[in-house]
Amino acid sequence: MGKHSAAEDDASAFIPPDGGGPADPPIRRLAAISLHTSPLAQPGTGDAGGMNVYIEATARRLAARGVEVEIFTRATSSDLPPIVEMVPGVLVRHIVAGPFEGLDKEDLPGQLCSFAAGVMRAEARNAPGHYDLVHSHYWLSGQVGYLAKDRWGVPLVHSAHTLAKVKNAAMAEGDDPEPRGRIIGEEQVVVEADRLIANTAAERAELVGLYGADERLIDVVPPGVDTEVFSPGDRAAARQALGIGPDEKVIVFAGRIQPLKGPDVVVRAVHQLADRYPDQRWRLVIVGGASGAGRRPGHQLHELVDLLGSRDTIDFRPAVPAAELAVIYRAADVVAVPSYNESFGLVAIEAQASGTPVVAAAVGGLTVAVADGVSGSLVNGHDPGRWADALAAVTLDAPRRDRLSVGARQQAAQFSWDATVDGLLRSYRAARDGARVDQGRTGIARIDQIGRIEANGSPLARVAGR
């Protein structure tokens, strides 16, 4: 990235303000679809991660601006009430689709029909025109999103969050390739969506180059960070609260423990650091739970730690709420983000907002989230020796770490959830003003006087149970 800002890098990618005034009708109500994971779930466990944070943070702020948000997600427990008010103006609707437990994310395509029917039934209880638009998150939700678009006669905005073709091009050892069915599903959503949200200009280029998306319909809207939660603090006090000694060299990895996130890279790197610098006290704090392939025998991180004999230097901790995670960031000398792919990398921004430098892989959105040499460093590849070098360069050079800490705070200050919501609202208005209705694709015959789509005996009508 150099010395210029991430905002400057992507400035040309933002769509201009809509210039709306009193005559511009507001967005009243949004249907957000997050099939496979709920914004109420604890990030760092199961399939919950940055997407959960994103949906929760933007929904709160949309509601604060007068936009009602209803989030549809799959129920994962019989104890969950059908509707939960997250905050005033934000409802989470739990849709029963398949068994409550025992389904991995990879099993969920088989529940798309059931989930879509549940969403349609929930909407059918409302007066026509209840939602102004649909925002789907991840490809599974996009499949339901474009059904809702056609059935309700509203525009669809879609956020991919991750892309199968990008993941398959940068697979970690032990990870499974994304199936062709997902790729086809993503291609379908790209065609159907009225607007696509990309976290960075690089993601926009991937959507265009790999999926044939229309660049004119892609809006670059970076995620943000809650600086009221993630802010600098007393490192000594944070360490005391966590039972960490003042003289320890502390490296933090936060996130789901799965091959894609590369936790094994930092485990091996810290093992090398302990060998290189035996007089130093090293501690790697790993915050999060196993997910996906990371739960399988032979791929579990605990097994690698035992194989290396590194139990004395590794501190496993469960996923924690944001306020507690901020304390862990403050206690660290550096936060490591060795992912094989990230569309953005919220952990990197949260850590920097807490005043902690970040050493991250030079991939995807991390090259925007981290300013190389200013707020941390970017590492090419995943060789543990190279990562050990990069981590040592920060942890063992106190003046350099202090400079990077200042740069980290400045870097994070460029990203805010309010700015994210500004971008989303511009995109929503652009989708509403330019929404397309394809007369030949799904048997849609006409749009009636109140703007609802009438499907003359189409499969959509039957799936929707209307």
From Swiss-Prot:
Any Pfam family from its record, for instance, is Glycos_transf_1
Q: What is its EC number?
A: 2.4.1.250
* Binding positions for Mg(2+) per the UniProt entry: Y329, R330, A332, T356
Q: Name one GO molecular function term.
A: D-inositol-3-phosphate glycosyltransferase activity
* Superkingdom, taxonomy of origin: Bacteria
Task: Give the record's GO biological process terms.
Answer: mycothiol biosynthetic process
Alphabetized, the UniProt keywords read: Glycosyltransferase, Magnesium, Metal-binding, Transferase
| Keyword Glycosyltransferase applies | yes
Q: Where on this chain does UDP-N-acetyl-alpha-D-glucosamine bind?
A: Q42, P43, G50, R256, K261, V320, E342, E350
Region of interest: Disordered:
1-27
Output the SUPFAM superfamilies linked to this UniProt entry.
UDP-Glycosyltransferase/glycogen phosphorylase
Per the record, what are the reactions this protein catalyses? 1D-myo-inositol 3-phosphate + UDP-N-acetyl-alpha-D-glucosamine = 1D-myo-inositol 2-acetamido-2-deoxy-alpha-D-glucopyranoside 3-phosphate + UDP + H(+)
Q: Does the keyword Isomerase apply?
A: no
Q: Which InterPro entries match?
A: Glyco_trans_1, Glyco_trans_4-like_N, Glycosyltransferase_grp1, Mycothiol_biosynthesis_MshA
Record-listed 1D-myo-inositol 3-phosphate binding positions: H36, D47, A48, G49, G50, M51, N52, K105, Y138, T162, R182
Q: Subunit structure of this entry?
A: Homodimer.
What protein family does this chain belong to?
Belongs to the glycosyltransferase group 1 family. MshA subfamily.
State what this protein does.
Catalyzes the transfer of a N-acetyl-glucosamine moiety to 1D-myo-inositol 3-phosphate to produce 1D-myo-inositol 2-acetamido-2-deoxy-glucopyranoside 3-phosphate in the mycothiol biosynthesis pathway.
Put simply, this protein is called D-inositol 3-phosphate glycosyltransferase
